[in-house]
Amino acid sequence: MVNLESFLIEAKKQTYANEKVEKVSNTRQNSKDYEYKKDKMVYHDTYFGGTNFIGEEVVYVDDKTYWAMNYYGVTLDETLGEEAMDKALRPALMNVGKDKDIIPVRGPKEWINGEYKYSFDVTGNINCFSGIETIYKNNEKIYELKCNGGLIK
């Protein structure tokens, strides 16, 4: 039996969110890729860009596409560069799964780190969902991401 939510929590903490983890070889020109494997399940995250980026996450079970999510994120204050990612996004994403009332496809519903506030609002369930992730610095919105995904049949 597939426990997708538990696997996603493990995988996300062992890929992009974890700054200690190295990328794997890119699968497409100029892509940045991460991969996590456990038993018969594989998680692959590939994205393009830096402060403005687009990407997708795919879960394979027994070598078959099982679940996927795509996302597009924009840093609204370009002077911050990677600062928002390092001080707010990655640490927030490491808290995936802490809120039991929200599906583990990004971070928690809300997370605060000093002057940064992360929030994620999602509708639907792990089978079919859409969400908006935002980061504020001193109450000013500096980043937004939209995502959607679900089971692949």
Where in this protein do the model-derived segments appear?
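Cysteine-centric segments in proteins
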Residues: 1-153
